């Protein structure tokens, strides 16, 4: 016996989430339909609302409902510092560590040629434009210490080397292969304080 077409479509839709395979998607679909229909409605409404209202900030590329996000609009931030992170979760970790008061640029990924992710896919043209805005003096590369994160940091360092900017890399208080999202705020704060210049 085959499942109803609408149930199959829901299961396949849930598989687009990271780390969700066919069995997990099936369990989620059954749970939402059988045990938590109110939760399913909230999920559908929230997703619909987010798709309609959330966009990328014109300056930092982070998610926002405004043209320019709250961080980029703040007069309390230091516009001379620009911290480059891979994902919004990395920006959130930096903010929770209370170790940085400059501006950000969120790549929304990292270079991964095997996955078809090159400079265009992670908005390096927008990063270059932002770095050239005459306010930025230092670019802090806070990509993850994974192979792809290191390659991304190296590529950006090379791209910006002739722009008259100080280019630094967060210190390796973070474990090799580690991702910012999973690091405690104290370790992250120390890594930012001990950043080193990229040569």
UniProtKB/Swiss-Prot annotation:
Pfam families given in the database record: RecR_C (PF21175), RecR_HhH (PF21176), RecR_ZnF (PF02132), Toprim_4 (PF13662)
Toprim domain location: 80-175
Keywords, alphabetical: DNA damage, DNA recombination, DNA repair, Metal-binding, Zinc, Zinc-finger
UniProt keyword annotation of DNA-binding present: no
Positions annotated as zinc finger (C4-type): 57-72
Keyword 4Fe-4S: no
Record SUPFAM superfamilies: Recombination protein RecR (SSF111304)
Domain of life: Bacteria
One Gene Ontology molecular-function label: DNA binding
Leader sequence segment: none
CDD domains hit by this protein: TOPRIM_recR
PROSITE patterns xrefs: RECR, TOPRIM
Record-level GO BP terms: DNA recombination; DNA repair
NCBIfam families: recR
Function: May play a role in DNA repair. It seems to be involved in an RecBC-independent recombinational process of DNA repair. It may act with RecF and RecO.
Family indicated by similarity: Belongs to the RecR family.
Protein known as: Recombination protein RecR
Gene name per UniProt: recR
